[in-house]
């Protein structure tokens, strides 16, 4: 079996995102997708912690510790960005208002079964229902 690196998966996924799409970025590998997007494609990024119009990772003097993505990494905001609570963020995803949601995978089996969250106790994770595949 040919194994892809996480970076190769992120690069491949970035190539599949259409110009102008609204895309939710989850935690982990999805964050790497952002670094592989073409700037001229005008892709609008949403972070599940409540940012629509998220920009690239912040560096140096651009770091604002109050502006972070869902993975708690400092990011920038694009002109016109908006901020809201995570319940609105998940409503945008579940309501079909975004073109794509890229979830981090906790575990994926050889047959494609997905575990994308662990609470450490019984319960329903916040991302339940977001992993449905529509073809």
Q: In which residue ranges do the predicted regions lie?
A:
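A generic local structural motif
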Residues: 9-12, 31-32, 87-89, 125-128
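Glycine/threonine-rich flexible loop motifs
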Residues: 111-121
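Ligand-binding beta-strand-loop-alpha-helix segment within the catalytic cores
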Residues: 59-109
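Conserved small/polar residues in nucleotide/adenosyl-binding loops
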Residues: 133-135
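Short acidic-glycine loop/turn motifs at beta-strand connectors
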Residues: 39, 109-111
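N-terminal active-site beta-alpha-beta segment that forms phosphate/nucleotide-binding
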Residues: 1-78
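Active-site glycine-rich loop that binds ribose-phosphate moieties when present
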Residues: 81-87, 119-130
